[in-house]
């Protein structure tokens, strides 16, 4: 009997040990369960934060790419239209050359002077053409408010809204208008 009591005691101790281990395991599982839920919540928060930062990064990258393209275009435009201001100033000189040629053509005196003025005028026009300045064709063309500046209207036998006289030539550099042509338009 002693042995059975001793065995019984050992069994009880083992049971108590198992019970305490079981309780500790249950407590650990419950605490881990709470921690697991916390970890899942933190993971979801970090994932949302990452997606937000990644989205901001993509927008910033697109903005930078657009900025680089815009700067390259502006640099190209600077080179294309660098002569625009000086060409605009030279247009008044061209107008004066044209007036001088017209006034000397009426008088037959100073034929050599007329030739000299004509040569300088042609050279100036050639230089401007070489740098992209072109005359706007206006005579007998349909009136275009982007290219022409109508200062007069006159009854005409032809179609209406056509340029019938050019009072001052217009010029453009590449695709930009330096000065619109001042014209008379048919009614």
UniProtKB/Swiss-Prot annotation:
This is Protein GrpE. GO terms for biological process: protein folding. Homodimer. SUPFAM superfamilies: Coiled-coil domain of nucleotide exchange factor GrpE (SSF58014), Head domain of nucleotide exchange factor GrpE (SSF51064). Belongs to the GrpE family. Pfam families: GrpE. The keyword Transmembrane helix does not apply. GO terms for cellular component: cytoplasm. The keyword Methyltransferase does not apply. Keywords: Chaperone, Cytoplasm, Stress response. One of its GO terms (molecular function) is protein homodimerization activity. The gene is grpE. NCBIfam families: PRK14140.1. Residues 1-15 have a biased composition (Basic and acidic residues). It comes from the Bacteria. It is found in: Cytoplasm.
């Amino acid at each position: 009997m002693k042995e059975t009591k001793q065995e019984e005691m050992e069994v009880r101790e083992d049971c108590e040990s198992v019970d305490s281990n079981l309780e500790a395991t249950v407590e650990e599982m419950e605490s881990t369960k709470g921690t697991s839920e916390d970890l899942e919540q933190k993971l979801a928060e970090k994932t949302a934060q990452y997606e937000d930062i990644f989205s901001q990064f993509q927008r910033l990258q697109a903005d930078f790419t657009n900025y680089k393209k815009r700067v390259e275009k502006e640099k190209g435009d600077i080179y294309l239209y660098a002569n625009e201001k000086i060409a605009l100033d030279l247009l008044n000189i061209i107008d004066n050359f044209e007036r001088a040629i017209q006034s000397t053509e009426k008088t037959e005196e100073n034929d050599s002077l007329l030739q000299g003025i004509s040569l300088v005028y042609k050279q100036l026009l050639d230089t401007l053409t070489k740098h992209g300045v072109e005359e706007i064709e206006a005579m007998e063309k349909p009136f275009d408010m982007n290219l022409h500046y109508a200062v007069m209207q006159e009854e005409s036998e032809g179609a209406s809204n056509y340029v019938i006289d050019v009072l001052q030539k217009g010029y453009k550099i590449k695709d930009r208008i330096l000065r619109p042509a001042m014209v008379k338009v048919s009614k």
